[in-house]
Amino acid sequence: MMLQDKFISLEGKVAIITGAGQGIGLAIAQLYAKYGAAVAMVDVSDKCVEEAGKICELGTKAQAFKCDVTSEDDVKKTVEAVMKAFGHIDILVNNAGIIVRKTVLDTTVEEWDRCMDIGLKGTFLFSKHVVPIMIKEGGGVIVNTASGAAIKGVPDAAPYNAVKGGVAALTRGMAVDFGKYNIRVNCVCPGDILTPMLISEGLQTGKITTGDPQTPEEQAAFDAFISSCGDYRPLQRIGTAEQIAYTFLFLASDMSYYATGGSFVVDGGRCS
């Protein structure tokens, strides 16, 4: 057996992925399933239902779970449902999050709380209820979605910068606390990635007027926005969710068995 075949495999593993209805979360679920994992796809919407069905058609077990990651009761019930459906949990990907493109001066308390609750509190709650299971099972892997914003601030995005910095700090803290239980905890720090969240960012900043261009003018503005997102990084191109998902695969696999507490920057060089 080749080294890559032995280590890049998730055969027999069960992975929970939050925010799995679209974007990076969906790409992670699809890639994990491709490499043998059964995937529990968690989202506040019903988007996961159809996508889980598509994964099952490929011969891998997948199931959608509707959950509000900001509600401890919802999270607890979801983790219990995953255990009932799959029997064990080996991998947790805390990916759910939103972006608010405003400065401290412009951000309302409600916007601040919502960004914090989904991106940071949700990471805390799922970890709180999954880690005891991993301890009983002798170990596990947690991969959190942070951002390049945790390292280099994004202009006019105070809540988002704070949330992602918090996710990176929480990652390090959990790595220290749970290493003795054979639980590895890392985070991935993407840059601008072509996902629905990036489209939301363009709409919030007024750089585009629609995420579904219908006229030549709308398409030109959309293309210019996407192109501009890659202009200021050394690779001079924007990344895709599928490309980012491979870093999550690496961190979930035995290929990274000595890595914990790390922040893995995958941003085309923006933070260089």
What kind of feature is each model-predicted range?
Residues 14, 21-22:
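Conserved glycine-rich cofactor-binding loop
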Residues 127, 163, 171:
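Active-site helix of classical SDR
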Residues 132, 176-177, 257:
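Alpha-helical segment proximal to the catalytic Tyr-Lys
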Residues 124-127, 135, 235-266, 271:
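C-terminal substrate-recognition "lid" of short-chain dehydrogenase/reductases
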Residues 147:
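Residue(s) in the substrate-gating loop at a strand-loop-helix junction
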